[in-house]
From Swiss-Prot:
Region (G4): 136-139
Keyword annotations of the record: Cytoplasm, Elongation factor, GTP-binding, Hydrolase, Magnesium, Metal-binding, Nucleotide-binding, Protein biosynthesis
Known partners and oligomeric status: Monomer.
Protein's UniProt name: Elongation factor Tu
Annotated S-S bridges: none
Source species taxonomy: Bacteria, Bacillati, Bacillota, Bacilli, Bacillales
Catalytic activity line of the entry: GTP + H2O = GDP + phosphate + H(+)
Gene3D superfamilies, A to Z: P-loop containing nucleotide triphosphate hydrolases, Translation factors
Similarity comment: Belongs to the TRAFAC class translation factor GTPase superfamily. Classic translation factor GTPase family. EF-Tu/EF-1A subfamily.
Single GO MF descriptor: GTP binding
Native source organism of the sequence: Bacillus cereus (strain G9842)
Protein EC: 3.6.5.3
Residue ranges, annotated region (G5): 174-176
Residue segments, region G3: 81-84
Length: 395
């Protein structure tokens, strides 16, 4: 059969399955593709095809992830499923698989388990904004009251981590039975996708967000002024816009963009993804440097102290061979530059072993433009020893 031309008319959403090992994440992923395939919205993928997720070398870390895509009547989805718990931790912290929403799979037969809690916490920390619950293996539970109990438990757990537990859709189903083609259970998969369509909003496009460009290089053009180059991370910048220069300085400086150049051509505007040079009015060459960002006035601030969720590379992944302790002072690489920072470990944690993931407080020696969700890597003498994501700004 000829491959159907891919319709890009539908809005695109990135989602993934999360939850405890053996609660049925991969079976559910297979069931979604199989049920939607009947309506022509997907290519059916068997459990084995998804479970044999290729290992990806993402920036030197090995992550196994399965990517599938499918469509409902209103949307196009890219869906990630990770076989192992460590893969989720790495994926979510490095942002290798960005999620606009998650389907939390909980076995009705077992109820919430340790990784259920961990994945909810991780989702909260790395900023997965919406969660829909699929209560799986309901064919194995005859007792209606027991199902209601498990549902209440899951809702309470979600509320505990700051998700709206009372409002989150919970669908009771059986991924395996749906995969085997039993109509009643297939209907539950359709119900799940209807809830996902309705409950997880279409993400704001990068171009609709406030302008931000990390500065990679700076040079001066005689008679014209100072040019900052970099790749626009989000938003749109137009000639004549007033922007701020943020980070690595006591206070933000304000300037007007008097020219935008790309591939040696002058443009009226540039947008997310473009590599540009921005000509800045009244800025001396020494007042601006790599590692700062240009951003829409008031949209982002420079901070030096924050809490972060961090994944420390194992020895096998090229990380440290020995643990580190509180007051460890590595470099934190944000966007285009390294800044030294001091690590404080949580109460009761003496040390961090290679391969661990942990929440820590970091204080940089100079402020950097950061927000919740900003990704960074931790480096020591030029080599990466960990990855992190800003969970909360302290000051």
């Amino acid at each position: 059969m000829a491959k159907a031309k891919f319709e890009r008319s539908k809005p695109h959403v990135n989602i993934g399955t999360i939850g405890h090992v053996d609660h049925g994440k991969t079976t559910l992923t297979a069931a979604i593709t199989t049920v939607l395939a009947k309506a022509g919205g997907a290519e059916a993928r068997g459990y084995d095809q998804i479970d044999a997720a290729p290992e990806e070398r993402e920036r030197g870390i090995t992550i196994s992830t399965a990517h599938v895509e499918y469509e409902t009547e209103t949307r196009h989805y890219a869906h990630v499923d990770c076989p192992g718990h460590a893969d989720y931790v790495k994926n979510m912290i490095t942002g290798a698989a960005q999620m606009d929403g998650g389907i939390l799979v909980v076995s009705a037969a077992d109820g919430p388990m340790p990784q259920t809690r961990e994945h909810i916490l991780l989702s909260r920390q790395v900023g997965v904004p919406y969660i829909v619950v699929f209560l799986n293996k309901c064919d194995m539970v005859d007792d209606e009251e027991l199902l209601e109990l498990v549902e209440m438990e899951v809702r309470d757990l979600l509320s505990e981590y700051g998700f709206p537990g009372d409002d989150i859709p919970v669908i009771k189903g059986s991924a395996l039975k749906a995969l085997q083609g039993e109509a009643d259970w297939e209907a539950k998969i359709i119900e799940l996708m209807t809830e996902v369509d309705a409950y997880i909003p279409t993400p704001e496009r990068e171009t609709d967000k406030p302008f931000l460009m990390p500065i990679e290089d700076v040079f001066s053009i005689t008679g014209r002024g100072t040019v900052a180059t970099g790749r626009v991370e989000r938003g749109i910048v137009k000639v004549g816009d007033v922007v701020e220069i943020i980070g690595l300085a006591e206070e933000n400086a304000s300037t007007t963009v008097t020219g935008v150049e790309m591939f040696r051509k002058l443009l009226d505007q540039a947008q997310a993804g473009d590599n540009i040079g921005a000509l800045l009015r009244g800025v001396a060459r020494e007042d601006i440097q790599r590692g700062q960002v240009l951003a829409k006035t008031g949209s982002v601030k420079a901070h030096a102290k924050f809490k972060a969720e961090v994944f420390v590379l194992s020895k096998e992944e090229g990380g440290r061979h020995t643990p580190f302790f509180a007051n460890y002072r590595p470099q934190f690489y944000f966007r285009t530059t390294d800044v030294t920072g001091i690590i404080q470990l949580p109460e009761g944690t003496e040390m961090v072993m290679p391969g661990d993931n942990i929440e820590m407080t970091i204080e940089l020696i100079a402020p950097i433009a950061i927000e919740e969700g900003t990704k960074f890597s931790i480096r020591e003498g030029g080599r990466t020893v960990g990855y992190g994501v800003v969970a909360t700004i302290v000051e």
